[in-house]
Structures are given as C-alpha cells and as structure tokens.
C-alpha cells in the first residue's frame, strides 16, 4: 500500500497541490479536522491527485510544542499492513517521526496459539531510512528479550542470542564462566547468581574497528530477579 503523509498547521495551508480544494475542505469539515496538534485524518485515494491513501497530520499552532517521536507512533498506529510512505512535506524532525512509525509496529506473539508475529514492512520513498531500520531491529531484539519469561531465558540462551545478533558484524564475543568470576573477585555478580541454580556468566563484546574515540558500554543482564 502507498501512503502519502501531509503535515498541516491550524491555518490549513499547503494542500492545494495535492487535493481539489473544495472537495478537501468539505471532507475536512465533515470529519472535524482543523489541523490541531496530533490530529490525524485518513483521506481516501479518490480525493488525492496522486490516488494514494493520504494521512493529513495536524501540527497545531506551534510545532515547537510537538513531540515528533510520539507523533510518529500515532501515525504508525494507523498503519495495519505493509506500506510505502511518502512525506509530501518533509519536517526537520523527520527521523524522529520515522522512528515512531517503525517502533510502534512491534509485536510479541510468541506464546499465542495462532502466531501473528510478522511485523509490517514499512519503507520510505525518497528517504534513506537504513539507520532507522538498524535501530528498530535493535530495539525489537531487546523488547523480545524483555518479554521472554525467565523460564525460556537462561544465561546460556542469552549468550546464544548475543552471538546470533553479532554474527558477521565484526564484534568479537568473549564468554567468562563462574570459575573466572570467582578468580577475578566478581562478588556482586556471584552474589546475585546465588539466587538461581543457573550459573552466571560475564560477556565482553569487542568491536575493534578503526575509530578516533574508544567507547565502553557496561550493563547488566539480570535474567530473573524477584526484587528486594
């Protein structure tokens, strides 16, 4: 499906190029669309000069007040199939809008008897969204891990998931076991690990690409925690 997206403020200017003015005005009035902040109106293809489905998105009086990521999620929630999107007027915060559109497509149906876990394939005409896709895939990977119950998320399974993720990426993964943790005084990790019959591990991922700066990211993956 091809979808055009047109952003309009509350003055409703800038649509003449894409619609017959009289028909457009009548349609907006019928559906009480006034270009207010976060208003979204779906306009049928028969009204558009491009003959595509068009989402008219309201920006209100002052677009400085708009959270463009949240606006993207509102737009994305209206899309329920694969779609090729064209922005008729590009905003300076288009990347945030794209992120919102993509992230809201997430589904986690792994434990449903009828699996409908396929994610809508969204592409963007005339825009390079490759970085947005990489971020989306990373976010979805993390969400899948979070949503997977501890019973199916052992440390060993987590290690396998990490290795699958970084395969062919140039990232070297080193895995250190409980004995290594004991020898290197990782008391905190070992202390938390005592709450489970599954032994803890310590993972190191090294990306040794040439770069001006070296960055270390440190985090913990507590796969099961009852709180305290």
Positions of predicted regions on the chain:
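Short amphipathic alpha-helical segment within the helicase RecA-like ATPase core
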Residues: 1-221
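Short acidic (Asp/Glu) and glycine-rich catalytic loops that position anionic groups and cofactors
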Residues: 228
């Amino acid at each position: 499906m091809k979808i055009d997206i047109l952003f309009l403020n509350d003055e409703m200017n800038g649509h003449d190029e894409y619609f017959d003015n009289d028909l457009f005005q009548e349609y907006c009035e019928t559906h009480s669309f006034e270009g207010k902040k976060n208003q979204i109106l779906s306009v049928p293809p028969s009204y558009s000069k491009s003959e595509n489905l068009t989402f008219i998105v309201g920006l209100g009086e002052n677009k400085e007040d708009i959270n463009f990521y949240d606006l993207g999620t509102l737009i994305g929630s209206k899309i329920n199939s694969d779609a090729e999107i064209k922005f008729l007027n590009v905003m300076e915060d288009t990347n945030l809008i794209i992120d919102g559109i993509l992230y809201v497509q997430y589904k986690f149906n792994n434990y449903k008897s009828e699996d409908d876990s396929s994610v809508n394939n969204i592409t963007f005409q005339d825009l390079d969204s490759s970085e947005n896709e990489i971020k989306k895939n990373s976010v979805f990977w993390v969400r899948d891990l979070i949503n997977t119950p501890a019973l199916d998320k052992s440390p060993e399974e987590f290690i396998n998931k990490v290795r699958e993720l970084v395969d062919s990426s140039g990232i070297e993964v080193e895995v250190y076991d409980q004995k290594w943790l004991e020898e290197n005084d990782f008391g905190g990790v070992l202390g938390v690990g005592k709450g489970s019959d599954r032994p803890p591990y310590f993972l190191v991922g090294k990306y040794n690409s040439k770069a001006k700066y070296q960055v270390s990211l440190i985090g913990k993956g507590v796969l099961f925690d009852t709180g305290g």
